[in-house]
Amino acid sequence: MALPLAWALDLCFGEPRSAWHPVAWMGSSLAPVGRLLLRCSAGWAFFGGALAWLVGAAAIALGASALQSHLIELSPWFGAPLLAVVLKPMFAWRMLRDEVAGVEAALGASVEAGRAQLARIVSRDVTVLDAQGVRETAIESLAENLNDSFVAPLFWYAVAGLPGAAVYRFANTLDAMWGYRGRWEWAGKWSAHADDVLSWVPARLTAMLLRPCLRWRYWQLLRNEARHTPSPNGGWPMGAMALRLGVRLRKPGFYTLNAAAPSPSADHVAQALRFATHAAWVAVVLAMLATAARANWS
């Protein structure tokens, strides 16, 4: 019962305030560690980054496991709703949907307004983007974050319960903070690779949810498209979305997906939101079935 209740909370209320959000707590608690690691040599930065990840993941796994065990022992009328409240911050769909829809709405006013709205959900420089670039980036963010913020946490919840979802969100948060080249090269290397490992299966599952297709030729095409991105996982949901919409998606200077296709229009953004919404609902149903099966086996 916890998962459908958590899904209902997301649809009705979206994200809790940062002061009450466990993922925000993860980020704020590790920010001082990151600043310290940047002062270290490459070797010590790598060791410290790996140690911080391992200690943090272990603490979160143990805490989430203890909390889940305690809530399960309560009456289902109390335990399930409380577990849903704890589980809800581990994934985010409504916020992602609304932010991407807001980009297109802002573009209706001006390109500058569209850029400002887009900057809320991406870290890249948006000042150089025209209207087409804003739409392409919004669709890319929708597809990639459908995996990172929704499908992957649900996948790990289905596999390992609340500890699985919490550890994944920790790994993804640390990757978002430290998983960059340049000055974060060594401090964030462990975090980046850990996120790659934990996201490997969910990213391909997200691609399947965005475009269900059993034809081998399609998966060969998608695999080739996914290889264009520097991430071993991000190209799968983005490539699936590009092929499903029949549009080009690109990050200038880094990659182009479905290069021969036209740029997306406002209608394509609306279609992308519909496809992602359908994928999100299917992901919830699959996670519920998998969770029920795991409970029966245990």
How would you name each of these model-derived features?
Residues M1-A166, G179-S298:
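Hydrophobic alpha-helical transmembrane segments
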Residues Y168-M177:
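Alpha-helical scaffolding flanking metal-ion-dependent phosphate/phosphodiester catalytic sites
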